[in-house]
């Protein structure tokens, strides 16, 4: 168990405890995307910067764009530099165990041996026997019969075993051993003294059997016969038949596949790490729903048994966490693991705000997550970096001054969660085993509808009734389960009631344990589908509900809570309550006793109460009997004022359209990524002149920022350019230039030489994610950025016009990225709450010497004396309107990936792509009003 360093004070409240505690072990870490040619000084500088932002460590992560050869001596030298600097800074380092993802193939090296490649099955109905097939069947009245060569049938139901040239067979222990030898061992050979110190351990990412078809392994056949005493091929056709007689085979098959997944991959890594004095963390693939857990390992919960710090991921703004985070939080509670990691914020887009990031984290921490791995901190935004599943943290983030506050918040919340135990009297048996009944990889509809949709209704009922519970996974129950005095025990946890949640299928062990529990007077509820199968066989299951779902026990301190919440107890007996409201309306909470609300952002506690209103998209943290005297804010009056626009940082124009002249004399023009894909698909090799143009209404000074690429002959309006290093990115350069009235042109020469290789990796439909994730290339035509004192007008720049409150993107600040200032005057006295109305990432309110920020919540508060007060409001944008994506037709709320920018694969020519819209889609920015409550 991780121990924090703290001073002992007998009568302290939670805020005092946090102040007296070293929270470093609970501070967020980041995926540090090392995606360029690595330089020692820059590595050290970025680590120091991260430390100043309140981060506790990094995951050192090779990603697309990196040109330092992976696992080369240069690579290990840079790893050593980073470990040395991290040690000096007191930061933790996790080594990501792959180049790209998923983990296991050593950046593609293990694929050279065909025996290592991932296996999968394909099914065809044929008119003749194919001796090259893996298995051939007749199908008589729905019953498959394995055919030998020479036997006849009306139709030949044929199964082929295929192999993937893009990923490895991680269920094969020999492959995992090669992976360890090629990846883990070299780190130990070089850095053994740092293991268990600054090199905390390894992060393994999305290991999976072949996810794009029905999976199998080279060892499945032998292991199936060894486990069940049956021939695998006798029933293999059932993996493709949607009927009840297939259930027993599918239950056996996917239980075996999950065991091979856990024992032959996770456990081998886990055992190696424990033997070498370090830890294992990382996550499986697609933990969000029960049916999607079939895409990687046929059940995620069991993998958490073989990690020191079990982990999940939660992508995009609105990905639900009710299954993934509750699943992992429950197993961690049952196994006594007090650190639970989430890889989070990836794909949430450049438009995501600190308030949205806080909610993304809160909705996972409420279920037991307590350590955050933030996705992503780019070594460089150049090339693939800026489109790599944003958001991206670092110096280019306009609200970077508030980033430490975000990290301080989650360090404090993580400490509280990790140091406490949840009061959860109910065990909810999940329907993971039921997924196997109807699961067909190429038609998941039945599994989704029969399992996940029904379970969602049960989860909603539990939430409405304020039931506090843990999940119980039946495979975990097999290993850790028991009964005691009418209670169910799982590892170190005891549950006084059990709910079967939409479980059509149960393991025989589960039926036995619950039978024992009920016989001893235990409480059992059933919701959703009732159990009808045991180990896949239709059975009159001898379990009867003796309590209604709504009557399940809940903590006595909770009277009414229609939200996700956790009531937790610290070792010294102090309790706290944490609830999260993902809804669009405020929600009411009623507790029994006195609970003092705490604001972790400001470090304030307020007088105890028992009834609370949790704001929309907000959360509540309250300490039982907290010793705080300050009353909670109550407003007698609210006024709304329209602020006056004062000024702004330099404006920006993003130029993303290019004209490319080829050696043949042909010219292509349009969106840079469309032009690039068109050239690559043609297989073009040769020189080209790349031109960016924009118009200006008058001569004016500008600053041009471009990426460092292997180009030559750079000119602006025909004159050579004297670039200098940009302060915002190691691979950006800038130049002060004089734009002229009319058209202005930035141009250079480049040469495409690798079109065939790029085409093969990026645009062949058969090439999966794994190979693209570790592929580095240069387009030679990335967007460029014009900064200066101007307004944006169409594709050009013009004289600044007066600005007013409202959306500034409609007032000539289309691509603005930075801070603007407003002012207003108000008469108020005492405690004042200031709520910015509009679109922003962070708002700083300045009144004389007083400062307060609206960052993680929607308001700022400050104490004012009597009279009129002049306020300055510093309002920060996100990075979205500078970096995009601008032309993607989809809604970004579902997640943003590189394809959202490049629209990869869809270009029929440089102008035509069904995913492309020629309009430039922007996100509103600016304040329309400020509400003042006092």
What are these regions (language model features)?
Residues 131-140, 710-720, 842-847:
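Extended low-complexity, serine/threonine- and proline-enriched intrinsically disordered segments
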Residues 485-486, 501, 506-512, 729-733, ...:
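C-terminal structured "cap/appendage" subdomains that terminate the fold
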Residues 2, 6-10, 22-29, 39-45, ...:
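Carbohydrate-binding surfaces of carbohydrate-active enzymes
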Residues 744-750, 832, 869-875:
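Extracellular beta-strand-rich recognition modules
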Residues 135-192, 604, 609-630, 741-743, ...:
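Extended acidic/polar, glycine-enriched regions
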Residues 135-172, 236-260, 329, 333, ...:
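Alpha-amylase-like alpha-glycosidases and glucanotransferases acting on alpha-linked glucans and related
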Residues 98-109, 627-639, 751-797, 876-934:
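Glycine/proline-rich low-complexity spacer/linker segments in large multi-domain proteins
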């Amino acid at each position: 168990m991780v121990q924090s360093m703290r001073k002992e004070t007998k009568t302290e409240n939670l805020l005092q405890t946090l102040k007296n505690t070293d929270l470093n072990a609970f501070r967020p870490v980041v995926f540090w995307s090392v995606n360029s040619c690595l330089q020692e000084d820059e590595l050290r500088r970025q680590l120091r910067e991260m430390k100043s932002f309140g981060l506790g460590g990094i995951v050192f992560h090779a990603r697309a764009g990196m040109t330092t050869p992976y696992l080369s001596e240069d690579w290990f030298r840079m790893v050593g530099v980073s470990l040395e600097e991290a040690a000096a800074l007191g930061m933790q380092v996790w080594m990501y165990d792959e180049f790209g993802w998923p983990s296991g193939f050593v950046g593609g090296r293990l694929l050279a041996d065909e025996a290592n490649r991932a296996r999968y099955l394909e099914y065809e109905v044929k008119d003749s026997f194919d001796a090259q097939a893996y298995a051939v069947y007749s199908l008589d009245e729905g019953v498959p019969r394995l055919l030998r060569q020479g036997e006849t049938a009306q139709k030949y139901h044929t199964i082929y075993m295929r192999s993937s040239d893009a990923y490895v067979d991680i269920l094969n222990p020999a492959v995992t051993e090669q992976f360890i030898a090629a990846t883990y061992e070299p780190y130990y050979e070089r850095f053994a003294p740092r293991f268990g110190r600054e090199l905390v351990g390894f992060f393994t990412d999305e290991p999976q059997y072949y996810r794009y078809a029905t999976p199998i392994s080279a060892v499945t056949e032998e292991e199936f016969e060894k486990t069940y005493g049956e021939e695998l091929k006798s029933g293999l056709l059932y993996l493709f038949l949607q009927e009840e007689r297939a259930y027993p085979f599918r239950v056996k098959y996917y239980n075996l596949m999950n065991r091979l997944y856990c024992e032959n991959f996770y456990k081998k890594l886990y055992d190696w790490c424990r033997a070498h004095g370090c830890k294992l963390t990382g996550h499986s693939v697609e933990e969000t729903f029960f049916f999607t857990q079939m895409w990687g390992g046929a059940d995620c919960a069991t993998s958490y048994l073989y990690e020191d710090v079990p982990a999940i991921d939660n992508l995009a703004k609105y990905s639900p966490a009710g299954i993934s985070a509750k699943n992992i939080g429950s197993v961690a509670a049952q196994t006594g693991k007090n650190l639970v990691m989430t890889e989070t914020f990836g794909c949430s887009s450049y438009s995501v705000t600190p308030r949205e990031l806080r909610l993304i984290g809160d909705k996972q921490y409420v279920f037991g997550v307590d350590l955050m791995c933030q996705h992503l901190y780019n070594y460089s935004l150049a090339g693939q970096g800026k489109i790599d599943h944003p958001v991206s943290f670092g110096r280019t983030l306009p609200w970077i001054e508030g980033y430490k506050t975000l990290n301080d918040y989650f360090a404090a919340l993580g400490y509280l969660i990790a140091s406490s135990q949840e009061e959860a009297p109910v065990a909810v048996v999940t329907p993971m085993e039921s997924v196997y009944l109807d699961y067909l990889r190429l038609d998941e509809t039945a599994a989704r509808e029969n399992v996940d949709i029904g379970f969602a209704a049960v989860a909603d009922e539990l939430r409405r009734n304020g039931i506090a519970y843990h999940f119980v996974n039946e495979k975990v129950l097999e290993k850790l389960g028991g009964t005691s005095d009418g209670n169910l025990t799982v590892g170190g946890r005891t549950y006084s009631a059990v709910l079967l949640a939409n479980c059509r299928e149960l393991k025989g062990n589960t039926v036995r344990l619950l039978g024992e529990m009920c016989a001893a007077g235990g409480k059992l509820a059933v919701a959703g589908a009732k159990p009808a199968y045991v180990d896949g066989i239709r059975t009159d299951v001898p379990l009867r509900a003796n309590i209604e779902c709504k009557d399940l026990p809940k903590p006595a301190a909770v009277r009414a809570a229609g939200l996700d919440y956790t009531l937790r107890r610290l070792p010294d007996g102090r309790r706290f309550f944490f609830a999260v409201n993902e809804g669009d309306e405020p929600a009411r909470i009623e507790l029994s006793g006195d609970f003092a609300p705490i604001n972790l952002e400001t470090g304030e506690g307020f007088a105890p109460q028992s009834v609370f209103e949790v704001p929309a998209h907000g959360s509540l943290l309250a300490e039982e009997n907290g010793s705080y005297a300050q009353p909670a804010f109550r407003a007698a009056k609210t006024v709304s004022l329209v602020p006056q626009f004062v000024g702004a940082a330099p404006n920006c124009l993003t130029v993303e359209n290019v004209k490319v002249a080829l050696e043949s004399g042909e010219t292509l023009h349009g969106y840079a990524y469309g032009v690039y894909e068109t050239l690559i698909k043609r297989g073009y090799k040769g020189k080209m002149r790349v031109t960016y143009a924009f118009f200006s209404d008058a001569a004016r000074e500008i600053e041009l920022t471009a990426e460092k690429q292997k180009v030559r002959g750079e000119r602006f309006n025909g004159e050579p350019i004297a670039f200098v290093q940009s302060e915002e990115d190691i691979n950006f350069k800038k130049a002060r230039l004089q734009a002229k009235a009319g058209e202005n042109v930035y141009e250079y020469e480049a040469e495409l030489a690798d079109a065939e290789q790029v085409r093969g990796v990026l645009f062949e439909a058969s090439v999966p994610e794994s190979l693209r994730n570790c592929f580095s290339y240069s387009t030679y035509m990335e967007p460029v950025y014009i900064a200066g004192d101007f307004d944006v007008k169409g594709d050009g720049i013009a004289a600044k016009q007066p600005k007013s409150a409202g959306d500034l993107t409609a007032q000539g600040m289309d691509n603005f990225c930075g801070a603007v200032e407003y002012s207003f005057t108000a008469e108020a006295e005492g405690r004042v709450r200031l709520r910015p109305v509009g679109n922003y990432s962070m708002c700083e309110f300045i009144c004389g010497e007083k400062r307060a920020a609206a960052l993680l919540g929607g308001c700022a508060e400050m104490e004012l004396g009597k009279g009129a007060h002049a306020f300055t409001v510093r309002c920060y944008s996100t990075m979205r309107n500078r970096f995009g994506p601008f032309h993607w037709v989809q809604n970004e709320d579902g997640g943003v990936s590189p394809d959202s920018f490049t629209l990869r694969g869809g270009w029929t020519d440089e102008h035509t792509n069904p995913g492309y819209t020629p309009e430039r889609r922007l996100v509103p920015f600016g304040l329309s009003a400020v509400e003042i409550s006092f």
